[in-house]
């Protein structure tokens, strides 16, 4: 779908991948952004706009059914709530400064139909705060861990739970290794099994978590459709 001479919209992405296209506000000219969002809104029930600064919200004045989540800088355009899939995502944040990126991931996972639970400010500097929250991992299909500074919470959680864990490094921290660099490298070098996305990539973490959780939910609802293989067996 073409929008003037500056955009070609992928309106079939959700049908192909199960994941909607999210409009990145950052870096776009105001009039380009507005025209893209309006064009999507004519074709899709809901449109997500990420990294939208609060002072740009006025650009969409007059458009119906807007929900702006300031902490996550995420705008949702659309009236119909997304259908529930049964997917379950737990989001942990090491510190309060990591919450905005964690919230971006949470809201995106919810937009893909998942139920979410959160536990914030449970970082390793006071690791006793973490342990009571891990009971929720038994409920979850996948866990997202948002952490800045040294990023240690991601590898720690991945070594404690039997669910897929997505590490979400956050650009908190300063000096050598600051702005999320140390957190990213720590998560990439983890010896515990940890999937890692880019710095501040809350949208990507939320999309990937929802994709995993929704597949698990489908298997939970139809347990007989795919029989598990015995250890060492190969499917014909």
Q: Whereabouts are the PLM-identified features?
A:
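Short, acidic/small-residue loops that bind anionic groups at enzyme active sites
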Residues: 69, 157-180, 196
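Short glycine/serine/threonine-rich phosphate/pyrophosphate-binding segments
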Residues: 33, 98-103, 127-128, 147-157, ...
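Long amphipathic alpha-helical segments
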Residues: 1-67
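Glycine-rich phosphate/diphosphate-binding loop of Rossmann-like nucleotide-binding domains
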Residues: 85-128
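C-terminal binding/interaction regions
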Residues: 172, 176-220, 229, 234-236
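Glycine-rich oxoanion-binding loops at beta->alpha junctions
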Residues: 74-76, 115-136, 181-182, 197
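Glycine-rich phosphate-binding loop
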Residues: 132-170
């Amino acid at each position: 779908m073409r929008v003037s001479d500056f955009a070609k919209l992928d309106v079939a992405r959700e049908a192909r991948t199960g994941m909607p296209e999210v409009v990145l506000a950052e870096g776009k000219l105001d009039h380009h952004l507005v025209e893209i969002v309006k064009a999507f809104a004519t074709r899709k029930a809901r449109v997500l706009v990420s990294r939208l600064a609060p002072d740009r919200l006025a650009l969409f004045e007059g458009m119906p059914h807007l929900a702006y989540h300031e902490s996550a800088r995420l705008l949702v355009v659309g009236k119909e709530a997304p259908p529930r899939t049964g997917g379950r995502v737990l989001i942990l944040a090491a510190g309060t400064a990591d919450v905005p990126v964690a919230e971006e991931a949470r809201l995106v996972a919810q937009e893909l139909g998942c139920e979410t639970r959160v536990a914030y400010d449970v970082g390793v500097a006071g690791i006793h705060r973490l342990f009571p929250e891990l009971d929720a991992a038994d409920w979850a299909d996948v866990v997202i861990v948002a952490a800045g500074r040294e990023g240690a919470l991601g590898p720690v959680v991945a070594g404690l739970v039997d669910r897929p864990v997505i590490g979400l490094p956050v650009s908190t921290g300063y000096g050598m290794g600051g702005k999320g660099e140390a957190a990213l490298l720590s998560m990439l070098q983890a010896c515990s099994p940890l999937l890692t996305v880019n710095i501040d990539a809350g949208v990507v973490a939320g999309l990937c978590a929802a994709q995993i959780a929704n597949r698990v939910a489908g298997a939970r609802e139809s347990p007989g459709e795919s029989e598990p293989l015995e250890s060492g067996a190969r499917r014909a």
